[in-house]
Amino acid sequence: MTNQKDIFSYLVPGKCAHLAGIGGVSMSPLAEVLHGMGLKVQGSDMNDGPSVEHLRSLGIPVAIGHAADNLGECDFVIRTAAIHDDNPEISGAVTRGIPVFERAQAWGAIMKGYKNALCISGTHGKTTTTSMATHIFMAAQKDPTVMIGGTLQLLHSGYRVGKGDTIIAESCEYCNSFLSFFPTVAVILNVEADHLDFFKDLADVEHSFRRFAELVPIGGHVVANMDDEGARDALRGISQPIFWFSYDDPAAQCRAENVVWTDGLPSFDIYIRGSYYAHVSLRVGGKHNVMNALAAASAAYLLGDSGEAVGLGLATFTGAGRRFEYKGSFHGADVYDDYAHHPGELHALLEMAKTLPYKRIICAFQPHTYTRTKALFNDFVKELRVPDVVVLAEIYAAREQNDIGISSMDLSREIPGSVYCPTLDKVTAALARIACPGDLILTVGAGDIFKAGEKLLKEEK
């Protein structure tokens, strides 16, 4: 990996950037941003798909598969955390003396050009909260630059390049990526054990988030969830002042008051330092989304946005792509898709789903990575015993090889009545067989489980 300070000399018009893993959720928007800055952009990915097709429509060439020849005459390489040193493009670049930078280094360098860098982190809730903040700052007419790890309907993509002085960036802890950022406002939603293929344990994860908070300069702000034990532990004794948000703890600077639930959707007042700030009516359900809204509102307050902008922005937010996203109806059963791939995210999703007026919850779950499934096995079992019916797809490998001999079959043995499906086609068939009018069908996971739901809906037609 090349030193981050060196990347600034490469992010100039006319330079040619090769992005290895260009179709990824934060790589494809990076490709577009660099393209918009006047760089020549090319890349490669193991899989074709909508993001790759979109990049090609912009005139960005994308090769499928990784090979040293893909580098062409590029000036530098940017890679995702999933692209390792033994990848032929990385080893080829090293052999030729072409500098290799991490994706986070590129985003960090871009971030340095903004007065306000709002970086939103947490084990889960990052995409939703970043999307909420985007709605608020757009309502406040701040014209922000945005990088989200998902698709936001407001933007019709996962990014935008604004002309304002604020950048809003989803900030991931995996491989300490967010430590390459330059936050002026660092938001920490929650801290739990995850990415245990990289981190040793929860204490290691907490240490990473603490280092992230310590990046905030004097005059900046650390915003954190007082209701989350991991966040409190990570920040205990830190020198930076902390702006806490909470559902109802009076010790927090920001909290919700007068919460009313109507058909599973919350409306509430936001009080900051004891004074009324904003009224919010959310169009997404779940207590976790109240917390996400409080986090986004806290950041907006600290950066000078009005309470009116907060209320208006959040009133128009209907969810981010793959976050309880309505896909359609199959013989009277509603089909939703969600990105949840950690037990904490599953818990929040299923708790929210239980408040909705469906006869049964059918959850088609695809675990994401072998190491996460093994490390959090008992937690997954606990959460997957909540739905009325569970259909288990095989584990989505992502960046891993199955060297530990684990399978979704192992989960199925611990979940009474569950159905194990080795292929997505079998998941679709199982859902078609099981579903009844009035059911809620959830396709859940960070891999390609959504395809099973989409195929189910095609069968309806």
Predicted regions and their residues:
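N-terminal leader/targeting and accessory segments in enzymes
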Residues: 1-102, 106, 229, 257, ...
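Phosphate-binding loop of NTP-binding sites
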Residues: 8, 33-36, 56, 70, ...
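Nucleotide phosphate-binding/pyrophosphate-handling subdomain across enzymes
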Residues: 10-18, 26, 30-33, 37, ...
